């Protein structure tokens, strides 16, 4: 991996997490989270797409943003949903750079790994974004037969 400034590395990780788990990345997210210009956000996306995960994001005019290609594989993050959930949970008004930064000497309790497919999370995010409803099936340990 090329030598990067710390802030750039954090933005590239955010690009990967958002694209992987939300299925859509827009420059506005990076601008708001990191306090950067649209040109810088576009430059970071282009850099990710040419230097780190070549041609893994394509611009989609229908969604007005970048979407991951079929078979997208994260290269800067582990690909576990916990990274994405931690990013969302700990944002709480903080600049995203502080959220994604590792804090040496500080330990936190990690959520157990979950077997979650990005496609499922993307549909949930899309429903939240568009105000749509989802039809789901639920099964519990005490009642393993799925029901709506």
Residue positions per predicted region:
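Short beta-strand-centered aromatic/proline hotspots
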Residues: 147-148
